[in-house]
Amino acid sequence: RAQPTIASYYKDWGYSTAYVHPFMSSFYSRERVYANFGFDQLIFDEDFTVPIEYYGTYIEDKTVFNQVEKLIKETDEPLFLHTTTMQNHQPYDQGENPEDEMGNYFQWIEHTGTDFEAFINNLKEIDEPTVVFMIGDHYPSLKGENSVYDQLGMNGDNCGVLYEQPFIVWSNYDLDYSGMPQEKFSTFYAPYVLMDLIDAPRDSFIQAMMDKMETTPVYSTNYDASVGRDEDLDILTYDRILGDIVSS
């Protein structure tokens, strides 16, 4: 069913909305599911309108950046665009040195760094206020009995650190970054961090999430087993996913 999402908020504010993902539309049923999330365009690997190149196993990040730039330039309205990249996803036992998973991973992220820098430099030349928010979901999954994680003594009891990710925020115009959170926060707050940064409109739900971030910045028993259940967050999640969406 259709649900209020971050994309639908931007759509209500007059933005065109797009989701770009350089992989199969059927994976995780993304095409069917994301059609309910308020995106005007869903662009999967078969829908790209720029030349496609691969790096490692998957479509390279440079191709995704090129597609994003093309959409920005072709869209007359303000654009909210969400993309999930694939280049640096497992498996890492590829190429000339399949046994050197760590080396392959470092090579791939170096490649992304170079292309991301070029992407940002291109956005500097775009005559539209533009903000980029980039975040990962977890560190790489490395196999083997003597992987770096084994050497660090990581196991199922202490692997939560793999999901503690830094983020990058960049804009081609002056923004006040003084209010950016300096402490750790759960990833589901990230859209509201961005909304606060650009001074987006706030309805009661957005304000409630921003208030919750002040009092409960991290909500995860994997991060801290002593964190109790938060009834407000649980009810809001239920309402948005399974309930009658009375919180809109």
Per-region residue spans from a language model:
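Solvent-exposed soluble domains appended to multi-pass membrane proteins
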Residues: 1-248
